[in-house]
Amino acid sequence: MNLVLMGLPGAGKGTQAERIVEDFGIPHISTGDMFRAAMKEETDLGLEAKSYIDKGELVPDEVTIGIVRERLGKNDCDGGFLLDGFPRTVAQAEALEEILKGLGKSIDHVINIQVDKDALMERLTGRRICKNCGATYHLVFNPPAKENVCDKCGGELYQREDDNEATVSTRLEVNMKQTQPLLDFYEDKGYLVNIDGQKHINEVYADIKELLGGRDK
């Protein structure tokens, strides 16, 4: 089963990815993990990627695509895979089609976890962190017993700058604009399946599991 997982920041991709790979016995392949593994193994492409990352530059598409090609060609992908964080653009999606064609494979589903912007804002701006011990809370989903005070150590809670409304709103807008052409591409291909991510996480996974046909034997 060859899957691509999509969703905006805060949509809950990580939680659902963990469940899918555990239930269906396929590797969870994220862009970050691929880069780290290629750099650790010191492959030619891994070393090339490292040279860009060390300079704080974006890794060019041809290097990223080469690393994806190497990773999908490994034995643990014979029974399928879950791609997360790749592709990000239509050009990368077209390259992925060519990679899979060369491996005699194709995408089964592109799972897009949909959550509206207001709900994402609530999820992403509600996080609070203890200045003292680093414990994480959420004003709605996991609030401290006493406002702005850590349950564990009594330290003061704060909101990271990245989590304020203006920053989160901008990040979501940028992601939406970047993601839409990719969603259109996969919808035209007939791969795209939208999953309602505003339900409880167990209900979201039940919908995904139903799509995938229950537990893979």
Swiss-Prot record:
Gene3D superfamilies in UniProt: P-loop containing nucleotide triphosphate hydrolases
Superkingdom of the source species: Bacteria
Family annotation (CDD domains): ADK (cd01428)
One GO cellular component, as annotated: cytoplasm
SUPFAM superfamilies: P-loop containing nucleoside triphosphate hydrolases
Pathway this chain belongs to: Purine metabolism; AMP biosynthesis via salvage pathway; AMP from ADP: step 1/1
Predominant cellular place of this UniProt entry's protein: cytoplasm
NCBIfam families, per the entry: adk, PRK00279.1-2, PRK00279.1-3, PRK14527.1
General function of this protein: Catalyzes the reversible transfer of the terminal phosphate group between ATP and AMP. Plays an important role in cellular energy homeostasis and in adenine nucleotide metabolism.
Name of the molecule in the record: Adenylate kinase
Organism: Bacillus licheniformis (strain ATCC 14580 / DSM 13 / JCM 2505 / CCUG 7422 / NBRC 12200 / NCIMB 9375 / NCTC 10341 / NRRL NRS-1264 / Gibson 46)
